[in-house]
Amino acid sequence: MALNIFKKLFGSRNERLLKQYRKNVQQINALEEAFSQLSDDELKAKTDYFKSQISEGISLDRILPEAFAVVREAGKRVMGMRHYDTQLIGGMVLHEGKISEMRTGEGKTLVATLPAYLNALSGNGVHVITVNDYLAARDAEWMGQLYGFLGLTTGVVLSGQTSNEKQTAYNADITYGTNNEFGFDYLRDNMAIFAEERVMRGQNFAIVDEVDSILIDEARTPLIISGPAEDKSDLYQKMNPLVKGLEKGEEDLETKTSSGDYTIDEKSKQIHLTDEGHSKVEAMLVEVGLLEEGDSLYDAEHISLMKYVNASLRAHLLFEKNTDYIVQDNEVVIIDEFTGRKMSGRRWGDGLHQAVEAKEGVPIQAESQTYASITFQNYFRQYAKLSGMTGTADTEAGEFLSTYSLEVVVVPTNKIPQRNDLPDLVFLDIEGKLAAIVREVKEVVKTGQPILVGTASIELSEVLSSLFEKEGIPHSVLNAKQHEKEATIIAQAGRPGAVTIATNMAGRGTDIVLGGNLDMEIESLDNPTEAQIAQIKADWQIRHDEVVEKGGLMVIGSERHESRRIDNQLRGRSGRQGDPGVTRFYLSLDDDLMRRFASEKVKNMMRRLGMKSDEAIEHNMVTKSIERAQKQVERMHQDERANLLKFDNISNEQRKVVYAQRNELMEEENVSEIIDALRENVIETMMTGFIPPGSIEEQWNVAGLEKQLQEDLGLTFPISDWLQEDKGLFEEKLREKIIAEAKALYQNKMAVIDEKTRHHFEKEVLLRTIDKQWREHLNEMDYLRRWIHLKGFAQKDPFQEYRATAAEMFEAFLDEVMFETVQTLSMVQIQGADDVDAYEQQQIEERPQELEANHPAAKGISDAMNNAASDSETDSSDATYRRETPKVGRNDPCPCGSGKKYKQCCGKLN
C-alpha cells in the first residue's frame, strides 16, 4: 500500500527514466527538419565530425542527439524506414548499458542501429549478438547498408569461417554474430600460440538481441572447446613390450651410481632411467621404428617420446592390478587409495591410464579433453558495456540486475496494443486437449483468420501436424528440422487462412506480418518492374485489411512452458505494432508442468465435476495455480544458474590470470629473462628439499640433490667436490653457484642458434606447456566440481572446500608449468635451427586438428557440470592484446586474495 502511494507521488523508476529519455527525443526531433535538408555527402560527413569531437574528449552522451538524428535520417534515405520516437528511447536505453524491453514487432533490429552507430564512433568495435547464424547474416546485410552509407564497416562472424575471414569481421566497426560464436572465438584466441592467430580485438560494447534467451535460458551450461586428449594408441602398444626387457637397479649413494636400467622412487611414484637404461630403451625404439640409428630420446624431435616411455614404466612397475585399479567390463577402473572405492569415470593423466590399458590388453580409449571453457555469465561480464533487447525481460529483472548489473527498462509501444489474451482452457487429458485444438483451428480457419499454434517440443508439433493432415487442414510446420525454411514459413504465417505450427523458440527475430511479408515477396522476384511492385503492394493491402477485419493473428499455446517468459514470447507473436490479435492456451492435467506442480485442488475439483475428456474448465483459480507452478520452476532454475556461477567464478578468476599472463607472454619478443627466472625458481625449490633453509651442512643431503638435478634437469654437477674445494660455499652461495652454472650450460647449448630463433623457441615451449597443464588443470577442476558435494555429508561446506582445494590445485598447476618448461628446455638437445623446426613440426602434428566447440543443452546443474568434463597470415597489429587488469608489481599483494606476494602466487609465470 505504502509503495503504491509512493509511486503515485514520485512515479516508478521506469517512469522517471522514460521522462528523461523523452527530453532527448525532443532534441532529436528538433534536428530532423534541418538534417533532412542536408545532401548525402553532408550527412555522411557527420561521421568524421563526430569522430573528431570524440578525439577531443567530447563524450558520447553529448553527441547522442545529433548522432541519433543522423541515423534516423540515413534510415529514411537508405532503407525507407524512419525510427519512431519509442525506437529512439529503446536506443538510448541500450546506449546506457541497460536492457530495453520492447514488445514483438516494435522494430528491435532497427533500434540497434542507433547505439551501434554511436558507440562504433570510438573505434573500439561494437558486437551485435543474435540467436542464430541466419539472423546474424540477415541483420548484417540489411543494417550494413545504413552503416555503409554513413562510412562505417560491418562484419559478420559465422561458424565455419576461416581465421582471415573472422579477423576481417572483428576489425569492422560493427560485428554481427551469434552468442556461441563470440564465446568460442574468445576461447580459441586464448588457445593461440602466435599473436597473429587471434581474431578478436577485445570486448568493448555488446548489444544482445533476445537477451533473455541468451543470458538466462542458455546460461545454465558452459561453452566448451574439447578435443582428443592423447590419441596415440599405437605408441602405447609399441612401448608396452619394451618395459619388460628392462632390469631394476639399485642406488649406491657412496659412488653416486645406479646399477640396472632404472631405479624406483617409491615416495613420489616415479621411475628414473639410468644411463644404461636410456641406451637400452633407445636401442629398443630403433628396433620398433620409432627412432633411427644414432638418434637420441632427447633430440628435439623425439623428446615427447619420453612421456610414453615414462607412462609405460610407471604402469608396469608402480601400479598394480586389484590394488591401484581393477579391470571391469573391459575397462580400467581406478581404486581410491584411501577408501578402496571404485572411481568410475576418473582417468589418470599424462598418458598413464592409456599405458595401463595397454598393459592389461583392454581397448585404449580415445579421450575427449576440455581445452577451454567459460559460462555466458563470465564471458559477457567482460564487456566494458553490455546491453540487450527483448520483448520479455521484466519477469527476470532481478536476475539481470544481480548477475549482470543490467537494469530493465520497459519501453512503451509505438501504438496502443489491441491483443486480446483469453483465459486458459484446462482439459482432463492430452487427447481431449489436442482434439479441442483441432476443432478450434478447423472452425477459425474457415473465417480466413491466420493461426499460429505454439508447441513446447518437436514431438508435439509433429503429432499436431498429423492430426491436422487427417482433418484436411493445410498447414506449415516450423521446428528445428525445418530451420532453413524458417524465414519463408514465418513470412507466410500472417496470410489469410494460414495455419502454422511452431516450437516456442522457432522463428524468434522474424515478425509475423498480417497479410504476409511484403518485403520478402518483392525480394523473391528477379528484377521486378514498378508495375509488378505496385500490384504486389495492392494485393498485400487487400490481404492485410482482410486479416485485420477477421481479428488479426490467433495464437494457440498447446501447453504452458516452465517459464512465464516463454509463454509471453509466444503471445507476443500476435498484436504487433497495434494490430489486433487473440491468444489462448490449451492445457491438460497430463502436461508436464501441470502434472509436476499444479495443486491437487484443481485436479480434485475437475474430477468432482464429472468432466469428460473433451470438456474444459476456465477458472481464475486454475490460472493462479499455474502461475505459482511457473514461479516455483523459475526459482529452481535461477538457483541452478546462481550455483553454477558461484562455482565458475572460482575457475574464472584462475582463467583470467592464465589468459592475461598468456597474452602478455605472446606479446613479448624475448622471454629469456622469464625462462631464467623460472629456472632459478625450480632449482631453489629443488634445493629446499635437500638443503633446508637455515640448516647446517651436516643436515644436507648433497647426494640426493646431485641425483635429482641429473635426473630431472640433466645437470651433472659435482656439488660434493665444490664443497670440499670451497669451505666458504654456504647455502646461499651454493644456490647462486648452481643457478649460475645451470644458466651457463643452457646458454652454451642455445648458442648454436641465432637469438631470434631461440626467443621464438623458448616462447613456444612456454606457451605450449601452459596450454598442456591448463588442460590437465581444467579436467582436475571438473572432477573436483563433480564430487565436492560429498563434503556435505562430512558437515563441511562444499563451496568453501571447493574454493580452498581449487586454490591449492592452481598453485600446483603453476608449479607444474614452471617445472615442465625448465625440464623441457634443459633436457632438449639442440644442434642447430633444424632441430627447432623439427620440434615445432612435431608439436603441430601432435596438436588435434579438429577441436569440437560444444554448448550442451541446458539440464540440471549436475548434468551441466558433468558435460563440462567432457590457416592465416595477417598483420598481428590487428589483434593487439589489451591488458584487462591493472599491472601488479611483483612484490604487491596478489589480487586473487591469497594474502601472498604476487611473485609467489599468480605471478610465478611472469
Curated annotation (Swiss-Prot):
Alphabetized HAMAP family for the sequence: SecA
Pfam family, one: SEC-C
Source organism per UniProt: Hydrogenovibrio crunogenus (strain DSM 25203 / XCL-2) (Thiomicrospira crunogena)
Protein encoded by which gene: secA
Keywords: ATP-binding, Cell inner membrane, Cell membrane, Cytoplasm, Membrane, Metal-binding, Nucleotide-binding, Protein transport, Translocase, Translocation, Transport, Zinc
Region feature (Disordered): 860-910
Source taxon at top rank: Bacteria
Function: Part of the Sec protein translocase complex. Interacts with the SecYEG preprotein conducting channel. Has a central role in coupling the hydrolysis of ATP to the transfer of proteins into and across the cell membrane, serving both as a receptor for the preprotein-SecB complex and as an ATP-driven molecular motor driving the stepwise translocation of polypeptide chains across the membrane.
UniProt GO cellular component terms: cell envelope Sec protein transport complex; cytosol; plasma membrane
Cofactor note text: May bind 1 zinc ion per subunit.
UniProt-listed Enzyme Commission number(s): 7.4.2.8
TM region(s), chain numbering: none
BP term (GO), one: protein import
Cystine pairings recorded for this chain: none
Protein name: Protein translocase subunit SecA
Alphabetical list of Gene3D superfamilies matching this protein: Helical scaffold and wing domains of SecA, P-loop containing nucleotide triphosphate hydrolases, SecA, preprotein cross-linking domain
Catalytic activity from the UniProt record: ATP + H2O + cellular proteinSide 1 = ADP + phosphate + cellular proteinSide 2
Family according to the record: Belongs to the SecA family.
The keyword Metal-binding is assigned to this record: yes
Cofactor needs: Zn(2+)
